[in-house]
A protein has these predicted regions:
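Alpha-helical bundle regulatory/interaction domains
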Residues: 1-40, 44-204
């Protein structure tokens, strides 16, 4: 994934801009860590090793990340920003899921290692919350729709279901089908009211 993707320019919130800040450097760190974790567990990696493999200084690393465990959380936010967060804005449901998972599947070993650490629990807490906030913003600010109790329920359920379901996809032995098929199945699980409302992007 490149740092110069099709970004949602209509909502320049500080937290979104923060995700994009120094994106090229951060992506270099992600790629370096993914390579290192092919042979070395995350807990045994040092920041010095990561910096050497990334071609950056320690000061540059700490300007980008609080610690090595923050790298996975940033990458998830970065991928979501150009993928599922664009559903209903610039992408359909299928396009959003496919773009997101096509990026994540490149880093299966990286996320498998990161998920073994207790620090990963902060990601567990943040992903569903961020997805709910984004879906609410999309409905309200992009489609100009009112948020009914039913829609809020559907958003809550979908965010939880996405978070629990999507990681299973990367188990090719359990689900020996194409990514395209998995994305289609995911689309079929989206509550119909929510699906119909956001499947047509407002920006192309």
């Amino acid at each position: 994934m490149q740092a110069n993707g099709t970004w949602d320019k209509a909502l320049n919130k500080p937290e979104k801009l923060g995700i994009l800040s120094n994106a090229e450097t951060k992506l270099n760190v992600v790629n370096a860590m993914a390579d290192l974790m092919e042979t070395t567990p995350l807990e045994k990696l040092t920041v010095s090793q990561i910096c050497k493999a990334s071609g950056i200084s320690r000061s540059s690393f700490y300007r980008c990340f609080e610690d090595k465990y923050a790298v996975a959380q940033w990458h998830i936010q970065f991928v979501h920003l150009n993928g599922v967060d664009q559903i209903g804005r610039t992408l359909s449901w299928y396009e959003g899921y496919f773009r997101t998972e096509a990026d994540f599947v490149k880093y299966k070993r990286f996320y498998a290692g990161a998920s073994k650490k207790s620090d990963y629990n902060t990601i567990d807490e943040s992903i569903p919350r961020c997805r709910k906030e984004t879906l609410i913003e999309t409905i309200r600010d992009y489609h100009g729709k009112k948020l009914t109790t039913k829609l809020l329920f559907e958003i809550e359920a979908l965010a939880a279901m996405e978070f629990k379901t999507l990681p299973w996809w990367h188990d090719d032995a359990k689900y020996p089908v194409t990514l395209e098929q998995k994305c289609q199945w995911m689309c079929e699980l989206v509550p119909r009211d929510l699906f119909d409302m956001l499947n047509q992007p407002v920006i192309r």
